[in-house]
Amino acid sequence: MKRTWQPNRRKRAKTHGFRARMKTPGGRNVLKRRRRKGRWRLTPKVSG
């Protein structure tokens, strides 16, 4: 069976990146929550 983690930088950025988050109201809420919580990183590193 194929593993669930098949690294792909572009896919990662498109689904979890900052601009992807900013596009939707829900994504903006995620960023707001993470800012309020004081997270160092608002979005995951896109390092593949």
UniProtKB/Swiss-Prot annotation:
Origin: domain of life: Bacteria
Family matches, as InterPro entries: Ribosomal_bL34 (IPR000271), Ribosomal_bL34_CS (IPR020939)
GO cellular-component term (any): ribosome
Biological process annotations from GO: translation
Compositionally biased tracts (Basic residues): 1-22, 30-42
GO MF annotation list: structural constituent of ribosome
Pfam family, one: Ribosomal_L34
Keywords: Ribonucleoprotein, Ribosomal protein
Signal peptide: none
Region entry Disordered, spans: 1-48
Assembly description: Part of the 50S ribosomal subunit.
Note: The open reading frame (ORF) for this protein is entirely within the ORF for the RNase P protein (RnaP). The two start codons are separated by four nucleotides.
PANTHER family: LARGE RIBOSOMAL SUBUNIT PROTEIN BL34M (PTHR14503:SF4), MITOCHONDRIAL RIBOSOMAL PROTEIN 34 FAMILY MEMBER (PTHR14503)
Protein family: Belongs to the bacterial ribosomal protein bL34 family.
Protein name: Large ribosomal subunit protein bL34
Organism: Thermus aquaticus
